[in-house]
Amino acid sequence: MNYPEPIAKLIESYMKLPGIGQKTATRLAFYTIDMKEEDANAFAKALISVKRDLHFCSICGNITEEDPCEICQDKNRDRSIILVVEEPKDVMSMEKMREYQGLYHVLHGVLSPMEGTGPEDINIASLIKRLHDDEVKEVIIATNATTEGEATAMYLSRLIKPAGITVTRLAHGLSVGSDIEYADEITLLKAVEGRREI
């Protein structure tokens, strides 16, 4: 039996989310059908609002409602340090620990030759531009401890070091293959404190 078109379209939409297959999408679709109308409307409005009201900061690439973002506008931040992360969710994770007071730069991905992702496909050019424009003394590379994250860190290090800027990498507490997003605040704090030059 085929599902009615509205259900089929909803299932298809859910399947566009990462990690959501046919079964989970179907379950979510039927859960959505069972929702109160006001909850379904609020859910739909939240989806539309995220796409309409959020954009990427023109300086650091983080998600924001205003441009530049709140962090880039904050005059109390240490402008001599930029912490480079893969995704905006990593900025959120780092901010939870409330210890790091420098700036950020979001790459929106990592180098991955297997997937055809090269330097021009992620937010590297604007990072290099920032290093020439700003008074940056240190770049902390906080890519995930995966093969692609390590390759991206090494690539960035080779690009940045000739400019005389110290390049460090997060250290203690983050195991190989782990994502920053899932680390707790104490682990992240130890990783920032124990960073090493690369």
Curated annotation (Swiss-Prot):
GO terms for molecular function: DNA binding; zinc ion binding. Keywords: DNA damage, DNA recombination, DNA repair, Metal-binding, Zinc, Zinc-finger. The keyword Metal-binding applies. The keyword Metal-binding applies. Residues 80-175 form the Toprim domain. A zinc finger (C4-type) spans 57-72. Pfam families: RecR_C (PF21175), RecR_HhH (PF21176), RecR_ZnF (PF02132), Toprim_4 (PF13662). May play a role in DNA repair. It seems to be involved in an RecBC-independent recombinational process of DNA repair. It may act with RecF and RecO. Belongs to the RecR family. This is Recombination protein RecR. It comes from Enterococcus faecalis (strain ATCC 700802 / V583).
